[in-house]
């Protein structure tokens, strides 16, 4: 369903998008990557804090 919709839109628009919007696609990709990295790092730090919280309370 979604793939056929993408093909219907993408194929006629492809030359236009690849030329005119190449920079925008790169920017969008970078933004998505940065957001993903921040979110995964945030999850990791929260997981670390959660796992190190219990022994840390015992020491203080």
From Swiss-Prot:
Keywords of this entry: Membrane, Mitochondrion, Transmembrane, Transmembrane helix
Source species, domain of life: Eukaryota
Location within or outside the cell: Mitochondrion membrane
Signal sequence extent: none
Topology of the protein relative to the lipid bilayer: Single-pass membrane protein
S-S bonds: none
Protein name: ATP synthase F(0) complex subunit j, mitochondrial
